[in-house]
């Protein structure tokens, strides 16, 4: 048989890299039911606790009553409704840019932006730890594709010296598996000096960073000249679904004309856009969510240091615990689950070989008492893991 899928699957299982989908049987939130088991979850990207917010739910319901439940067509045919347009205007205001353009997913936004902006004869330079969707966009663009050392402006400058054509520098804003921030001021300075554009995927920074939740660009006090192309997702801190690109009028018009993942897909349900409008309102108005989240991050990091956990340099809700071995990461995750805590083990190829980890994510919906429960369980389980490994 030409396609020996069984052998490929067996190989992955033997390497402790086999993935399975847990079945969520409750709404998103700290307390969930997964595969029939009540658990306290620390693995969702619902950073501000808006995914199950009653006002967001009510906005979706009212939107469905007013606009129906389907987009019906692509944006360029007859699928671009008033709620879609209102969300784009709200996102432009939040990010401080002239315009924004809605996409169905973050993956599609990244592929659409990169492939619309560069092609054969051009250059794409990406951080080596960028999200898979960014890397795929670079490969699919047909442009000359290269990666620079993680968060290293000197490495980027060296590669820019060899670039040809239009050059797009691409980085995550917050790196999804490490939680660290891109050094945008340094990257932007290098890119501008070489006439390149900087594109930032702020999937994990939007809503959590910046005084008004505008994300990593606001956090660093940068503007559109520093970061001409800004990507954001709506399924994380915003608690709904979808993504967007924000930038100049010319950028958005170019994407409408040339971004195939935008052109050739049906628009989101208008009711979803209504829900997103409400979540954006809450994101800006209820600043206590970011303040509470920042306190939980401090609490977790201080407690983890006392336990002796190996954390990464992350000031964000993403707090990975580095384990190294995939089997050990799975074992620690299972030990926590037996104590009623859900923390996902992240293994290669999502992260580099030898750097398997538990990816703890915190939410404004968590309480200090819940974070302490996690720390207590880690204090109990982690020494057992080390003892078994000795």
From Swiss-Prot:
Reactions that this protein is recorded to catalyse: 6-carboxyhexanoyl-[ACP] + L-alanine + H(+) = (8S)-8-amino-7-oxononanoate + holo-[ACP] + CO2
Binding site for substrate: 19, 131, 350
Pathway assignment: Cofactor biosynthesis; biotin biosynthesis
InterPro entries per record: Aminotransferase_I/II_large (IPR004839), AON_synthase_class-II (IPR050087), AONS_Archaea/Proteobacteria (IPR004723), AONS_Proteobacteria (IPR022834), PyrdxlP-dep_Trfase (IPR015424), PyrdxlP-dep_Trfase_major (IPR015421), PyrdxlP-dep_Trfase_small (IPR015422)
Pfam families listed in its UniProt record: Aminotran_1_2 (PF00155)
Transmembrane segments: none
Keyword Transmembrane carried by entry: no
Modification type N6-(pyridoxal phosphate)lysine: residues: 236
This enzyme's EC code(s): 2.3.1.47
GO biological process, alphabetically ordered: biotin biosynthetic process
GO molecular function term, any single one: pyridoxal phosphate binding
Function: Catalyzes the decarboxylative condensation of pimeloyl-[acyl-carrier protein] and L-alanine to produce 8-amino-7-oxononanoate (AON), [acyl-carrier protein], and carbon dioxide.
NCBIfam families: bioF
Subunit (UniProt): Homodimer.
Family to which this protein belongs: Belongs to the class-II pyridoxal-phosphate-dependent aminotransferase family. BioF subfamily.
Protein name: 8-amino-7-oxononanoate synthase
Species this chain originates from: Pseudomonas putida (strain W619)
